[in-house]
């Protein structure tokens, strides 16, 4: 047989061009960066320590946009502990005895909850459900800047220039709703509860990259109820 061996080349992931391919450069030039919006990602959770979701870098980006305008950030109506506290009793998770402080991971991730395990561990560390949630969250809203530390000093540098990755809406906040965990998933009762909570929390869009062999009519009812709020609901259907 002929020698069919091939050299394995090193892969260099590069998402730097993906946003411009869908026209986001035009949106950015007109001021649409996602600032003041909330994206709910119902998935496997998130890497809370990842540089793309750094709270300091998120705050820095908003300060750059403000450009000295003291009212700019206030006008964004960012989700914070006080706003979560105000609606906590309306959330499905209220019965589990959590507080807004428990759910708050910072300005970039102001709400994060594990619906399947009924706790606030939304990382990928304690189950085998993959890091898919971080991937999805990054595509949607990975920060415009990433932290760079030199000794005791932290500065923020362009994410596109340094790590070749930036989300479509880099200045949006993320609502992390983990529906895959150590107890399995995703169960209808969990992601439907997450959809309802996302609406209460003021999500501007809801993403579910989920799939099943036969989706029952009840989930479509939940989606339609969400869409009439109106909140766009996006689901990736996988075979």
Regions found by a protein language model. Name each.
Residues 33-35, 49, 120-128, 161-162, ...:
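Substrate-binding/access-modulating region of protease and related hydrolase catalytic domains
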Residues 44-139, 143-159, 167-168:
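Active-site core segment of subtilase-fold serine proteases
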